[in-house]
C-alpha cells in the first residue's frame, strides 16, 4: 500500500497525527486526513508544509 505518516510540525516538535494516511485534503478549516478505511481526522488551522513520497511522510504546519 502507499499510505504515509502525517506529522504536525510546531517549531522543533514533530507530532504524529496519523500513522497510515491514504489521503490529505487542505480545506478552509484545516487539513483533513483520511486512512484507507475511511477514518477521518481534521487538523484545524493546518497547511501542507511538505509531502515526501519517497519517505512516505507528509508534514503539516499551523497556519
Residue ranges and their predicted role:
Residues 2-63:
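Compact, glycine-rich, soluble single-domain proteins
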Amino acid at each position: 500500500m502507499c499510505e504515509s505518516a502525517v506529522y504536525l510540525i510546531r517549531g522543533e516538535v514533530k507530532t504524529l497525527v496519523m500513522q497510515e494516511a491514504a489521503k490529505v485534503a487542505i480545506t478552509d478549516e484545516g487539513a483533513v486526513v483520511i486512512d484507507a478505511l475511511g477514518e477521518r481526522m481534521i487538523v484545524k488551522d493546518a497547511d501542507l508544509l511538505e509531502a515526501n513520497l519517497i519517505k512516505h511522510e507528509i508534514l503539516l504546519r499551523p497556519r
